[in-house]
Amino acid sequence: MRRMLVIRWILAIHLIATQVFAERIKDIATLAGVRVNQLVGYGLVVGLSGTGDKTGTKFTEDSFANMLTQLGINVPPGVRLNSKNIAAVMVTANLSSFMKKGQTMDVNISSIGDSKSLLGGTLLLTPLKGADGRVYAMSQGNVVVSGISASGSDGSSVTVNVPSGGRIPNGATIEADIPNPFYYSNSLTYNLHTPDFTTAKRMSDAINELMGPGTAKAIDAGSVVVTAPKKLSQRVDYVSVLENIEFKPGEAMAKIIINARTGTVVISSNVIVKSAAVSHGNLVVSITETPVISQPNAFASGRTVATQQSQVNIQQKNNRAFILPKGTTLKDIVRGINAVGATPADVISILEALQQAGALSATLIVI
């Protein structure tokens, strides 16, 4: 009995240890077809207090005239419409995969003309289309603007935030469902956020261990295909179990990311440096301009002249060298570079030189 208890404790400790670095499938992979779909439309915002598109903005005038014609109001040819209270806008929205007909979503409104502000405006009925050209939603409502603009008679103006754009909370109603392979496909495909052969293999093994052999198969470094239940009513429970399966992903490639503009350096924990010696020195060049006045003697037929005398001084700082032995890790790299008082710019130079020397076992990426 005691022996069995000890064995159970050992197994429990082993399971805890193996799950310390484990991650859920839902955190590192996305189910194919479950995505956000972008919608876009062109519309008119009316009711502006003289802050709309200026007279002469042709596409706004044409859109206004077409709208009046559709409402049964004839606009005589050649008549120019005053559009100071109207602005042409683009309407955008993100439609989630499982949102249904009749639900509402937020929309963003952005001026495309020379309107100064959309404050107080109302978006007229605007169809929102997907990439396939189909209408998936209709949008209309009062525009909420967080910015404000004011101008004086002398031409001075003050602008806070961006008044030429705004939002309509729940401003679009969904009119059509997005086709989704989740409902009709015989299999489910998980796409890894970061493609990796080891992660894909371990993920398929973890699924097969719980769901049965042959359930999942890694088809490449970025995708794992899982057999789906034929009954649609079982798929929700099935995916709920799948996405909570935990396993240990493969270690990422050793990388060093450098932002040359900001001096930011990010080094992954598995970066290894081969044996190398580093010495990084600095040349400080200073040029000083000193004015010199040349003044002639009294009663002499000369004039006072001011000239510049330049003094150039070059000073080299004697920085210490440090040695990176074979198998040096991230901690040793940071300690060694800090020991010589290197700045972020110096760190970038040192890392680039180490890679050129073949002593850096990592991919160096400069952004």
From Swiss-Prot:
Signal peptide (from-to): 1-22
One of the record's GO cellular component terms: outer membrane-bounded periplasmic space
InterPro entries: Flag_FlgI (IPR001782)
Pfam family, one: FlgI
Gene Ontology terms describing biological process: bacterial-type flagellum-dependent cell motility
Domain of life: Bacteria
GO MF term (any one): structural molecule activity
Keywords of this entry: Bacterial flagellum, Periplasm, Signal
Cysteine disulfide links: none
Subcellular location field: Periplasm; Bacterial flagellum basal body
Function: Assembles around the rod to form the L-ring and probably protects the motor/basal body from shearing forces during rotation.
NCBIfam families documented for this protein: PRK05303.1
Assembly information from the UniProt record: The basal body constitutes a major portion of the flagellar organelle and consists of four rings (L,P,S, and M) mounted on a central rod.
Homology family: Belongs to the FlgI family.
Descriptive protein name: Flagellar P-ring protein
Species in which this protein is naturally found: Legionella pneumophila (strain Corby)
